[in-house]
Every structure is written in structure tokens, then in C-alpha cells.
From Swiss-Prot:
Function, as annotated: Catalyzes the reduction of nitrite to ammonia, consuming six electrons in the process.
Catalytic activity, EC: 1.7.2.2
Positions bound to substrate: Y271, H319
Protein name, as recorded: Cytochrome c-552
Organism: Haemophilus influenzae (strain ATCC 51907 / DSM 11121 / KW20 / Rd)
Length: 538
């Protein structure tokens, strides 16, 4: 189909050249009419092929298991209760509040194209660079995306938006059961989810092993265990078919190396909110590649939202760090998240412990990178910086092309294009932006697996080229002059205005929410003993 389309357009270009070369000025009107008839004819031919290849998305939710309440499962969510027994681990964990994390980086203000790419979705209101685990609860409260709810049943977001934010989440799932947990508004969790990502997210803190100072790694979120079981099934079948060695990925039976990485898959993964109850689900039934997950979503007809400009059925990637890592050189060589971000260090008391100040490996180079690499810190940093620049450059090109495609699609709709005409181009926009977001939403993909990220971005450029070629045909058919003029989106304020977002209204509502509602949440949490003051530093 692609070859046919390109052949048609090459033919048109050649005919245009010949006509302009040989027809006299007196024949301009005839030439223009002939050129237009050629383009329209090509349009009908190519569009008939496009539309025969694409079906409309209809969401068919996959039925998900729902775990009942488990009142006997005790999860201690207050991180401060472990400070006395494990001071080195606690104090290093608390240090994630320091350094770069103290400052918020407003990514959408640095790159206003994001506001267009997420047009019609809450991410267009505010998107910030990630900070340390210490800030997880604070940041989800503060971000404009969660709105300004006034009651437990109010607001735009689902309870699922809390699911990665701290150990109160598995505690609540155990107390309420998955159905009652997920089938609620985000605001209902406000007085309950007050402890940021910490001890009980990764460790069985009530176990004998933990009491003896052993890691006692545990995943207490049922949906994560189900996802790893599904991934084990998918990858085992692929590895067997392709004659590759296979490592068991089901958490409860996995080896230590796999478990050390899978703990981070509690949160650093791609997921979506499934069904009416908005249940957090990992789309791993086919595997973890960008194509595997795209096929999963396309097969069930899932759409995160409909884009406000193009009307494309969009997908929003979350943060597929575990996926990209596992597909790249570090994952394939068994170098886990803990090896690079949580090295063994010696405390002031002489004890060796795992550093819980999760940070850039270059900050502890001798304990991380130097364990495997013989290059100097400066040499290795130069390599990583160069890879980051390559990724950013290609990512920027893809962003620019997808932004143009959204505006071109809007112009086509405004000119009278039909749903049938637009269907194939919109699917290409969906697939192109999905590839951009799969890479852009990952944390450190340029470091974890640069070859994977660049390959995904390159395929995204192919997809958006297909989209814009199809849109050019549609625009020409409907008499729209090209190139389509793109509004000024050079600043965030200009982009918000173009996209119809009243950012000041959103900010004022959030300010009032933080001033009136959040203090009530914290007071209720203190009364329940869920929120306590940190111990004094010795």
C-alpha cells in the first residue's frame, strides 16, 4: 500500500514538472485544472486502499481478576516506624528530598509542544520532570492534572492515580479489596495515602527475614503479580519458539536477579486503567516491546482519550522504564536497577548497607559504573551525554512532525473530510505519538537502552510520515492549500491559549484545594496514626 501511494505521488510530481516545462502561459488555466484532476484522482485511489486496511476502534475490555480484601495481610505503611532499626537505610531514603529534587522542572513550559501533543487530555495542563520518591504524594496532590476536588466523590481522576505513590496503597487494597479500591475517585484516597514511596512498597516488613536485616523483597500489589505472570507466559513462549534461554519472570518463583528488577516494576512500567472500575493493568500479554503493547491496545480497541485537534484515538504512555531496560543491553546482561541506582555503601558506623538515596549512578561512580566499565568517569559521562543528545534530537524531530499532523488533521476536518476518509491517517497519528511517548515518558531510556529508544523513534518518524502523506491527499481533495499554517506555540502560555486551556483558572482552583482540602486530609491521617513526624536527626 505504501509503495502504491508513493508511486502515485512520484507520478504526479513528474507530470507537474513536464506540464510546467512544456505548456505555454496561455495554457495555465488548463494546466492547473489538469493538475487538480490528477491529484483528486490519486486521492480517491489511495484513500480507497487506506480505508480498506483500517477498522474503527471499539473498546472491548478484557475481564480482569479482582482480589478480595485480605484483612490478615498486614502492611505497615508508616516509613518512620523503621527509622530506629534501620537508620542508614531510612536516612538515605529521606535524602531523596535533597539535591535536584528540591526544584520542580516544568517540562511543558520548557517544551510547549507537549501541550499540543496532549491536547484534550489532563497532561496538557501540567507535566513536570520526575523528582525523588520522597515527593511522590506531594507531587500528585499539587499537579493540575488531579484537579481540585472538594469531596471524596468529586474530581476528574480515578483512585488508580494513587497506585504508585506509596505503601498506603497496598495497605488499602488489602483492607478494601481491589474492587472497592479502584472503583473510587482519587479524592477518596486523600486522607489515607499520605506516606510516600517507602519501605513496605518493596519489603515484607512484617516478616522474620526483614526483622533479621534481610531484604525480604515483596510485591504486595496484586495487579503487578498478575502482570509478571502474564509476561512470564508471553516471553517463555517467544524464547522457546526462537531457541533462546529463558529466565523465569513470575515474581514468587523468580531468581534473585529478576526479583531485584521486578520490585521496581511496581511502578516504573507502562499501564492503563481498565474497564469501568479503572483498574490498573499492565498491557504485557504479548510482551513488552512498543509493537507488542500497541497490538494489545489495538486488539481491545483501547483509547486513553480523543485528541482535541485531530480527533485521533490516542494512547498515553506512562513510564515504561522496566520494559525499555529489559529490552536493552543492561537488562540483557542482568544489570539491574539496584546495581546502578542503589549501590552498597559504608555508613558512618562502619556497616555496609544498600543506599536508598536513589540517584544518578555517576554520583556514586566507583560503586556503580566502575564495577563493569573500565572507562574513566569523564569518558563514560561523555558517551552517555552524546547518546542523550542523539535521542533528544530525534525525539524533537518526531514531536515536531506529530504536532503538524494534529493541526493538519484539524484542517481536514474543518474542510469537510469524512470519518471514513480520516480513519487511516488518525491511526497513523495514534501509532506515531505512541512511539514518541513510549520513549519520552521513560526515565533515562538514553542510558538504559539507547539502541531500543532510537529504533522506536525511527519507527515513529515512519508512522508520522505515513500520516502526513495521507493527510496531504485529503487536504488536496478538499481544496485546502498546503502547507497548513501552524499557530504560534513558542511559549507555554501561547500553546495553552491555542489549545483552549484557561491555565489561570486551573491554578487558582488548585491553590484553593491545597489551602483548604489537603490540610483536612492530613489532619484525618494524623488522627488515624497514618502520618507521623520524622525522627530528629542524630
Amino acid at each position: 500500500m505504501k509503495i502504491y501511494l508513493r508511486f502515485v505521488w512520484i507520478l504526479i510530481i513528474i507530470l507537474n514538472f513536464l506540464l510546467n516545462l512544456f505548456i505555454t502561459t496561455n495554457g495555465v488555466i488548463i494546466v492547473n485544472a489538469f493538475k487538480k484532476s490528477l491529484i483528486v484522482a490519486a486521492s480517491f485511489a489511495s484513500l480507497s486502499l487506506f480505508n480498506s486496511a483500517t477498522a474503527e476502534l471499539v473498546y472491548k475490555p478484557l475481564e480482569q481478576p479482582v482480589e478480595p480484601a485480605k484483612p490478615d495481610l498486614k502492611i505497615e505503611s508508616v516509613n518512620e516506624k523503621f527509622a530506629e532499626k534501620y537508620p542508614n537505610q531510612y536516612n538515605s531514603w529521606r535524602s531523596t528530598a535533597n539535591g535536584d529534587g528540591e526544584n520542580i522542572i516544568y517540562a511543558d513550559e520548557e517544551n510547549p509542544r507537549l501541550i499540543v501533543l496532549w491536547g484534550g487530555y489532563a497532561f496538557a495542563k501540567e507535566y513536570n520532570a520526575p523528582r525523588g520518591h520522597f515527593y511522590a504524594v506531594t507531587d500528585v496532590r499539587n499537579i493540575l492534572r488531579t484537579g481540585a476536588p472538594k469531596t471524596a466523590n468529586d474530581g476528574p481522576q480515578a483512585m488508580a492515580c494513587w497506585t504508585c505513590k506509596g505503601p498506603d496503597v497496598p495497605r488499602l487494597i488489602a483492607e478494601w479489596g481491589e474492587k472497592d479500591y479502584f472503583n473510587a475517585k482519587w479524592a477518596k484516597g486523600g486522607p489515607e495515602i499520605v506516606n510516600s514511596i517507602g519501605c513496605a512498597d518493596c519489603h515484607d516488613t512484617t516478616s522474620k527475614d526483614f526483622a533479621e536485616g534481610k531484604p525480604a523483597l515483596r510485591i504486595a500489589r496484586p495487579h503487578v503479580l498478575r502482570a509478571l505472570d502474564a509476561l512470564e507466559k508471553a516471553t517463555a513462549e517467544k524464547d522457546k519458539a526462537e531457541g533462546r534461554p529463558h529466565n523465569n519472570l513470575s515474581f514468587n518463583t523468580a531468581a534473585r536477579t529478576e526479583k531485584r528488577a521486578e520490585i521496581c516494576a511496581n511502578c516504573h512500567v507502562e499501564y492503563y486503567f481498565a474497564g469501568d472500575i479503572k483498574q490498573v493493568t499492565f498491557p504485557w500479554d504479548n510482551g513488552q516491546t512498543v509493537d507488542d503493547i500497541e497490538k494489545y491496545y489495538d486488539d481491545i480497541g483501547f483509547t486513553d482519550w480523543t485528541h482535541s485537534l485531530s480527533k485521533a484515538p490516542m494512547l498515553k504512555a506512562q513510564h515504561p522504564d522496566f520494559e525499555i531496560w529489559s529490552l536493552g543491553m543492561h537488562g540483557k546482561n542482568g544489570v539491574t536497577c539496584v546495581d546502578c541506582h542503589m549501590p552498597k555503601v559504608q555508613g558512618a558506623d562502619g556497616k555496609v548497607y544498600t543506599d536508598h538515596q536513589i540517584q544518578n549512578p555517576f554520583e556514586a561512580f566507583d560503586s556503580t559504573c566502575a564495577n563493569c566499565h573500565d572507562q574513566s568517569k569523564e569518558k563514560l559521562r561523555d558517551i552517555v551525554t552524546s547518546r542523550k543528545k542523539e535521542v533528544k534530537d530525534v525525539m524533537g524531530r518526531l514531536e515536531d512532525q506529530v504536532v503538524k499532523a494534529h493541526f493538519e488533521a484539524k484542517e481536514a476536518w474543518d474542510a469537510g473530510a469524512t470519518k471514513k476518509e480520516m480513519e487511516a491517517a488518525l491511526m497513523d497519528i495514534r501509532h506515531a505519538q505512541w512511539r514518541w511517548d513510549y520513549t519520552a515518558a521513560s526515565h533515562g531510556g538514553h542510558m538504559h537502552a539507547p539502541e531500543v529508544v532510537l529504533r522506536v523513534l525511527a519507527s515513529g518518524l515512519d508512522k508520522v510520515a505515513d500520516a502526513r502523506t495521507k493527510l496531504a491527499v485529503i487536504l488536496t481533495k478538499h481544496g485546502v492549500k498546503t502547507p497548513v499554517q501552524i499557530p504560534d506555540i513558542s511559549t507555554a502560555d501561547k500553546a495553552w491559549k491555542v489549545m483552549g486551556i484557561d491555565i489561570e483558572k486551573e491554578r487558582k482552583a488548585k491553590e484553593e484545594f491545597l489551602k483548604t482540602v489537603v490540610p483536612q486530609w492530613e489532619q484525618q491521617a494524623r488522627e488515624k496514626g497514618l502520618l507521623v513526624d520524622p525522627p530528629a536527626q542524630k
